[in-house]
């Protein structure tokens, strides 16, 4: 029941949402849980970044790990100097008056450790890798600090031979993610001297599994002109559900084993932007208080989704810090002059399938005239948000427009079983 307790504490109130101490005898939050001092800033940054990416990619999938990005940028600040350092930390939402740099990095170290703690019921690989041209040498202070706080792995390569360098980087990331993230780089970038790669892969196990035998091919209505077939998972269960009276959407909250919980949000057709605009800590808190246990026939696509972003340009577009500008200063990274960073790349990947700890109920067959469960089909664009309850972290934020795009290697998303009967056309989608 600890997970339930943590969840209740997490979403108790807006003012205490990111500062309440979980169950324990020590009431000194900063001593016991320094990572929670990061939570408000991390979550606010998460939604700001997510909204920016959604606005810049209309009609496209968006998928990021905000907490992983925050770690990478905070780590990069260790090598920044002057205004660039200030820009990075302020852009992440930190006030150095309220929290010192040492406290920020120590809190991220604690958070990183907690997120990477062993949990045999899920697969999660996250990390940062720095690839440096062999003509450059890291400063000892930067190397030691990034290794201590963020477990950074630094490797040298020959960027004059981009074909060879890209193969080295791709192979490294592939091995680190057990083959889930491949071919991260393919285009030539002869000017590269320094590339930071931030990566994360996640595959959890549901507390209550979906019924494997009930998964069938169904239509997914991408837009008025495009319909694709997806393997649609099914479970009939008592689920946390809300038909929101404030925003035009319905949502469910499902739990993975461990500390991870997932919100699946289904906006009314044509209202996706309205819902995304309203996403905030307050919205999540209100939803969590309003969700009620309901009998639901739930249909969710089996998905394998990923997103890759060059954070350097994105931070500049957001007005945080243009990491690629010659005006930025990263003189705290290498012995030699390094006027700018070539690339800061983020890659996030997620697999969602039927597997769970407890067996799913069999497919429901109505035999009486009594009111049945409500039916909720995620067969049009939806929002997915995964949080870690214990650390109060935004693990993933996603906008799924087309579940068939961005599939990971080896993902089995096609079925041989017959499709379900379904209505045709965008307007016919439930």
UniProtKB/Swiss-Prot annotation:
Similarity annotation: Belongs to the serpin family.
Protein's UniProt keywords contain Oxidoreductase: no
Tree of life domain: Eukaryota
Site (Conserved cysteine within steroid binding domain): residue numbering on this chain: 249
Record's keyword annotation contains Transport: yes
SMART domains from the UniProt entry: SERPIN
Chief localization: secreted
Source organism: Ovis aries
Residues annotated for cortisol binding in this entry: 253, 285, 392
GO molecular function list: serine-type endopeptidase inhibitor activity; steroid binding
Signal peptide bounds: 1-22
Residues glycosylated per entry: 119, 175, 243, 259, 326
Cellular-component GO terms for this entry: extracellular space
Tissue expression remark: Expressed by the liver; secreted in plasma.
PANTHER family: CORTICOSTEROID-BINDING GLOBULIN, SERINE PROTEASE INHIBITOR, SERPIN
Coiled coil regions in record: none
Keywords carried by this UniProt record: Glycoprotein, Lipid-binding, Secreted, Signal, Steroid-binding, Transport
UniProt free text on domains: Proteolytic cleavage leads to an important conformation change. This reduces the affinity for steroids.
Designated name of the protein: Corticosteroid-binding globulin
Alphabetical list of InterPro entries matching this protein: Serpin_CS, Serpin_dom, Serpin_fam, Serpin_sf, Serpin_sf_1, Serpin_sf_2
């Amino acid at each position: 029941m600890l997970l339930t307790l943590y969840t209740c504490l997490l979403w108790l109130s807006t003012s205490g949402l990111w500062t309440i101490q979980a169950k324990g005898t020590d009431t000194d939050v900063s001593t016991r849980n320094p990572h929670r001092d990061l939570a408000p800033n991390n979550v606010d940054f998460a939604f700001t970044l997510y909204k920016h990416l959604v606005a810049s990619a209309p009609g496209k999938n968006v998928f990021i790990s905000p907490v992983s990005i925050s770690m990478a940028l905070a780590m990069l600040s260790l090598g920044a100097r002057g205004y660039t350092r200030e820009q990075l930390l302020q852009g992440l939402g930190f006030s150095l008056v309220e929290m010192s740099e040492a406290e920020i990095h120590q809190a991220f170290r604690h958070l990183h450790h907690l997120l990477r703690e062993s949990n045999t019921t899920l697969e999660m690989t996250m990390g940062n890798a720095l690839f440096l041209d062999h003509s450059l040498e890291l400063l000892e202070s930067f190397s030691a600090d990034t290794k201590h706080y963020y477990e950074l792995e630094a490797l040298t390569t020959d960027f004059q031979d981009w074909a060879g360098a890209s193969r080295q980087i791709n192979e490294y990331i592939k091995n680190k993610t057990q083959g889930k993230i491949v071919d991260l780089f393919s285009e030539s970038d002869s000017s590269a001297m320094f590339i930071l790669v931030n990566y994360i892969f996640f595959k959890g196990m549901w507390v209550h599994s979906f019924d494997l035998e009930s998964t069938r091919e169904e239509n997914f209505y991408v837009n008025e002109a495009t319909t694709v077939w997806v393997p649609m998972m099914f479970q009939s269960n008592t689920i946390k559900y809300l038909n929101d009276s404030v925003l035009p959407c319905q949502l469910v909250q499902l739990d993975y084993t461990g500390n991870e919980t997932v919100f699946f949000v289904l906006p009314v057709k044509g209202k996706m932007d309205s819902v995304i605009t309203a996403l905030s800590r307050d919205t999540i808190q209100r939803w969590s208080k309003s969700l009620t246990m309901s009998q639901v026939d739930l249909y969710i696509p089996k998905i394998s989704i990923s997103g890759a972003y060059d954070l350097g340009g994105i931070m500049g577009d957001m007005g945080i810090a243009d990491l690629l500008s010659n005006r930025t200063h990263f003189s705290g990274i290498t012995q030699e002059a390094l006027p700018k960073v070539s690339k800061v790349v983020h890659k996030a990947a997620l697999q969602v399938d039927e597997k769970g700890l407890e067996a799913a109920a069999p497919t429901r067959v109505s035999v009486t005239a009594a009111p049945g469960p409500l039916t909720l089909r995620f067969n049009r664009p939806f929002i997915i948000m995964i949080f870690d309850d214990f650390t109060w972290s935004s693990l993933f934020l996603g906008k799924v427009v087309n579940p068939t795009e961005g599939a990971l290697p080896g993902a089995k998303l096609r079925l041989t079983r017959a499709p379900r009967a379904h209505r045709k056309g965008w307007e016919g989608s439930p």
